[in-house]
């Protein structure tokens, strides 16, 4: 049996690869989609909040690039210095991909009961707390 670290890395790589493929038709990547979702959670979000909330998902340079891409593509705007907000196009883009992401989530959890999923997440969360 392979150790948990092996499967964590393989799962993350598979999730990223499949999400990037799924989102490419919408001009997004997994990281870009995550950035839009973080900004969507508040009326205005600081860049530093995006970097902090997604620190486990990507390095600061990658996140900063994703923010820059979303700004350049018109999905985000800067209502104030160092503040981000979704544009109407950004909201439309998130809504357009929501159904596809839901199908992706079903695919990625096929054959896994809700209880098994919760157990897996709980175990990984506890392991993370043990190590931080």
Language-model features: locations:
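Short alpha-helical
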Residues: 14, 30, 92
